Amino acid sequence: MIEKIWSGESPLWRLLLPLSWLYGLVSGAIRLCYKLKLKRAWRAPVPVVVVGNLTAGGNGKTPVVVWLVEQLQQRGIRVGVVSRGYGSKAESYPLLLSADTTTAQAGDEPVLIYQRTDAPVAVSPVRSDAVKAILAQHPDVQIIVTDDGLQHYRLARDVEIVVIDGVRRFGNGWWLPAGPMRERAGRLKSVDAVIVNGGVPRSGEIPMHLLPGQAVNLRTGTRCDVAQLEHVVAMAGIGHPPRFFATLKMCGVQPEKCVPLADHQSLNHADVSASVSAEQTLVMTEKDAVKCRAFAEENWWYLPVDAQLSGDEPAKLLTQLTSLASGN
């Protein structure tokens, strides 16, 4: 229902307009206060890059963060990552992730980013505290990438990158809750780069698509072409589950059943195993896999995806960030 409201298919969005105007008024006032320096943002001693979005829901932001961190690491840059840690329940904040940190403590995306990149990752509702925690333990870090947080103006930033879902784009264009917008589309004029996940990019936007890798068994780490798996049940607890199901079909997999879950939904063995029989093969997203490794069965697999950016702009962006991190 919420997708139909936000896309404009359902007329119910009109009933929510008063709340949307209030949301827009408050969020605009907050940004204006920081712009006019009525409120002061904290500036880190190293450059900060924000990877965020203008809309609620999944846009492919986390794969972009992983791509950015890995690309900078390949250029010899030491990167730290901070996140709010949505859904996390740590005993105290900031929390610096370790190999033993669970998704319940830190949230799904921070654990995924930590496991994929081996970069220092810290979570805190106050992102400046997360930055301080990383720099205290890793003083050699040269640049901070913040996963989400475009609207978290308490943290000063040097570069802003926005990720857009190229198919859904901005829906009906209204602020939450009548539409999907955290900020209006005009905000794109002030950011440094716009990355479009799928769809048809517009002038000045960087095209991106998610490239699936080999399926990985949660228990053994065995890898294989996902099309070799039989009697597949697909499960996705991400912002937009249909994107994952479409990716599987693109890989030649016709799932016997698709199980969409809420983004950041907590998972346990009983709930997951109820979705798949012993004769079937469960294929989930990597984001779900980080929550299921501790209790995985032998017929559970996940399909990792990597962000692939096209054109000349990604190289220019990386050159800019490398120079920034190097102090040039």
UniProtKB/Swiss-Prot annotation:
Which pathway does this chain act in? Glycolipid biosynthesis; lipid IV(A) biosynthesis; lipid IV(A) from (3R)-3-hydroxytetradecanoyl-[acyl-carrier-protein] and UDP-N-acetyl-alpha-D-glucosamine: step 6/6
* Amino acids binding ATP: T55, A56, G57, G58, N59, G60, K61, T62
SUPFAM superfamilies per record = P-loop containing nucleoside triphosphate hydrolases
Record key words, sorted: ATP-binding, Kinase, Lipid A biosynthesis, Lipid biosynthesis, Lipid metabolism, Nucleotide-binding, Transferase
Give the record's GO biological process terms. Answer: lipid A biosynthetic process; lipopolysaccharide core region biosynthetic process
The Enzyme Commission number assigned here is: 2.7.1.130
Identify the GO cellular component terms for this protein: plasma membrane
Keyword Transferase assigned to the entry: answer is: yes
Identify one Pfam family in the record: LpxK
Against InterPro entries, the record matches this protein to: LpxK, P-loop_NTPase
The question of whether Magnesium is a record keyword is answered with no
Q: What does this protein do?
A: Transfers the gamma-phosphate of ATP to the 4'-position of a tetraacyldisaccharide 1-phosphate intermediate (termed DS-1-P) to form tetraacyldisaccharide 1,4'-bis-phosphate (lipid IVA).
Q: What is the protein name for this chain?
A: Tetraacyldisaccharide 4'-kinase
Lineage here is: Bacteria, Pseudomonadati, Pseudomonadota, Gammaproteobacteria, Enterobacterales
Question: Source gene?
Answer: lpxK
